[in-house]
Amino acid sequence: MSKLNMTPREIVAYLDEYIIGQKEAKKSIAIAFRNRYRRLQLEKSLQEEITPKNILMIGSTGVGKTEIARRIAKIMELPFVKVEASKYTEVGFVGRDVESMVRDLVNNSVLLVENEHKEKLKDKIEEAVIEKIAKKLLPPLPSGVSEEKKQEYANSLLKMQQRIAQGELDSREIEIEVRKKSIEIDSNVPPEILRVQENLIKVFHKEQDKVKKTLSVKEAKEALKAEISDTLLDSEAIKMEGLKRAESSGVIFIDEIDKIAVSSKEGSRQDPSKEGVQRDLLPIVEGSVVNTKYGSIKTEHILFIAAGAFHLSKPSDLIPELQGRFPLRVELENLTEEIMYMILTQTKTSIIKQYQALLKVEGVGIAFEDDAIKELAKLSYNANQKSEDIGARRLHTTIEKVLEDISFEAEDYSGQKVTITKELVQSKLEDLVADENLVKYIL
């Protein structure tokens, strides 16, 4: 199955392996992502006319909003960034401006493209690294030697390279020259300040500056890999491709959009800068040009997915212009006790499988009786009903509490198989769930 060419049905089938329920949300997002592919198959003139239909997801925390978008972006290898609306401030106030989310997307896109190019050149990079280390370990040939000596040296070099590749010489120490660590740039500042930062770095830090280090062969492989990668990769082409990919197929997931909605219930206590953030966000979602350290990017073809619980506000509390930019709305269902059970038993990388794998490292086998899993689902659901509803995240808390002693004393259980029963789950959790005050603080 081609990742970029996945049909909506294939996308939903993939999501079903990791996320239980939420059929409508999966369907809407699968169509939106498929339309990204469809648009790119059209003539350039028509491509410009078709803009993505942004999505507003409404649902409580822990019901799968972020996970749905993140999983699709990952499988389709699209530039993706998740941000929280509440972290941004209106232009002129202290804090991150909304344009920084686009700069973050471009950074992720360039990194994605760079990793793809590195993967293509993986064998070539490995060969160059091994050859360089082998030449360091073998003394160089003096000038004017016979052809026979040259051939002997070539054979010795080949054997040395084979031994390095097989890891036989990993513990040997060699002295190599490596580049000085580059100075970090804060990419979350306005472009003008970013350019000043880059110019200052050019003045105070020369790229060719190198220092001698004594490293093991294993460490030298990693140090040289990064250096040789930079020489073999076409950084300019990577930047251009990353910029283009972010522009045509980038996805920005804006979580907690409800936190910047101006609720009429809060009246005079409402933070006035919330509406300012919405107005700053509007041109980016509508389509504007944002300057990044890699160049300018147009935002009209970026897919925006906004999500929020909307407990204290309603989608209609967002400014009308912003509401209009999210024409597709999907309401996610709250998790039932049955769905909690299915999350524990039917997902590909369920929480139970994760904990079993973690404790297997210590030589501890963990088995859950079906009744124990049902009890976990029931008590997690009850805890959500009695205190803050945090959806599937509650399962992490309850399982952690049940396995706490086993995890702490793992060496005592090494080589054993521990069975988690319904009675054990009840003894660890039932008193806590029964006490509403304790639920708030412990679960």
Swiss-Prot record:
Residues that span the membrane, as ranges: none
InterPro entries linked: AAA+_ATPase, ATP-dep_Clp_protease_ClpX, ATPase_AAA_core, Clp_ATPase_C, HslU, P-loop_NTPase
Signal sequence, renumbered to the chain: none
GO MF term set: ATP binding; ATP hydrolysis activity; peptidase activity; proteasome-activating activity
One Gene Ontology biological process: protein unfolding
GO cellular component: HslUV protease complex
Pfam families: AAA, AAA_2
Domain of life: Bacteria
Residues binding ATP: I20, G62, V63, G64, K65, T66, E67, D255, E321, R393
Disulfide bonds listed in the record: none
Keywords of this entry: ATP-binding, Chaperone, Cytoplasm, Nucleotide-binding, Stress response
Localization: Cytoplasm
Keyword Transmembrane helix: no
Subunit relationships: A double ring-shaped homohexamer of HslV is capped on each side by a ring-shaped HslU homohexamer. The assembly of the HslU/HslV complex is dependent on binding of ATP.
Family recorded in the similarity comment: Belongs to the ClpX chaperone family. HslU subfamily.
Protein's job: ATPase subunit of a proteasome-like degradation complex; this subunit has chaperone activity. The binding of ATP and its subsequent hydrolysis by HslU are essential for unfolding of protein substrates subsequently hydrolyzed by HslV. HslU recognizes the N-terminal part of its protein substrates and unfolds these before they are guided to HslV for hydrolysis.
Name recorded for this polypeptide: ATP-dependent protease ATPase subunit HslU
Organism: Helicobacter pylori (strain P12)
